[in-house]
Amino acid sequence: MLKVYFLALFLAGCSAFVLDEIRGINIGQSPQKVLVDHVNTVQTSWVAEHNEISEFEMKFKVMDVKFAEPLEKDSDVASELFVRGEIVPEPLPDTFDAREKWPDCNTIKLIRNQATCGSCWAFGAAEVISDRVCIQSNGTQQPVISVEDILSCCGTTCGYGCKGGYSIEALRFWASSGAVTGGDYGGHGCMPYSFAPCTKNCPESTTPSCKTTCQSSYKTEEYKKDKHYGASAYKVTTTKSVTEIQTEIYHYGPVEASYKVYEDFYHYKSGVYHYTSGKLVGGHAVKIIGWGVENGVDYWLIANSWGTSFGEKGFFKIRRGTNECQIEGNVVAGIAKLGTHSETYEDDGGAATSCSFIMCTLMVLTYYFV
């Protein structure tokens, strides 16, 4: 009888433990399939789908969670654009997609792949830079900015390479030191990404060393001449203001946002994500390209850097207006310094676009004064 009593206590304890695990305290070694089934059972805002990538491999796609927090020295720095008063308040649309407003800017549509390096902070920066150069130049300049250059050469000012980094510092690096061109692994440009996409038995990637030469097949420019510079880098909002973030995107293009990642996010397939269950895994940085409403839920439209097999062909939606996973608390952007001499850039498809002296000058004047 005593054995039966202790067995009952043991089973009750196990049941309580499993329930606590599923509720989000910590799913520990429980199968990820259990988590996916739980997510799909308790809510209908988004759909989770079990994937075959192990937790061990997936953890390398995020960074140290501290990099998702704003730098303390920037906590009271308002957006330079709002301080200058360049944005005139106006009604914003209920839905917006930067791909539709600037259809000639191919990089806005591009989904890149960071592989097993926590370089999301550098990806987000490179993507925003690429998009904004195109937007400011009215589509005549379309560089695919190198993640590798930012990742390997920004150093400890930005963070710890594949372990994570600060998005704002990546943009400041672009403004002070410039960034060359370069697509994903095996791509075009001066300095493409070192790491190939991987989906099974993937080793952890280590931060590549900083190089100051272009790949041998790139004959267009030397490293220093291939540099693209920013005119400014700034925080978009210090108050988690949804309207300020929307206004920035609507007028100037995509922005970079850092946020906290939980286990359930790895299994996102579609819908409007919000944290449901699972432990905190780390931080992540992504590119916000728009917003909208789905089934009555406000969302941000976001480009991830985990390849096109993730989510909605590489994109995802996350709840807007509630600072979900702190995504509205650390949003940054920058303004490009367009060249005023004849420049030719290689995009990731190898197509070149050019800008004449007169055309570039007119574009700069139009962008800032019209």
Curated annotation (Swiss-Prot):
InterPro entries in the record = Papain-like_cys_pep_sf, Pept_asp_AS, Pept_cys_AS, Pept_his_AS, Peptidase_C1A, Peptidase_C1A_C
Gene Ontology molecular function terms on file: cysteine-type endopeptidase activity
Under Pfam families, the record lists:
Peptidase_C1
Signal peptide: which range, if any?
Answer: 1-16
| Glycan-carrying positions | 138
Q: Which family does it belong to?
A: Belongs to the peptidase C1 family.
Stretches of the chain forming a coiled coil according to its record: none
Propeptide at 17-91
Catalytic residues per the record?
120, 284, 304
The entry's cellular-component GO terms read: extracellular space; lysosome
Check the record and name the Gene3D superfamilies matching this protein: Cysteine proteinases (3.90.70.10)
The name of this protein is Cathepsin B-like cysteine proteinase 3
Q: List the disulfide bonds.
A: 105-134, 117-162, 153-210, 154-158, 190-214, 198-202
UniProt entry keywords in alphabetical sequence: Disulfide bond, Glycoprotein, Hydrolase, Protease, Signal, Thiol protease, Zymogen
From which source organism is this entry? Caenorhabditis elegans
The EC code for this enzyme is 3.4.22.-
One biological process term in Gene Ontology? innate immune response
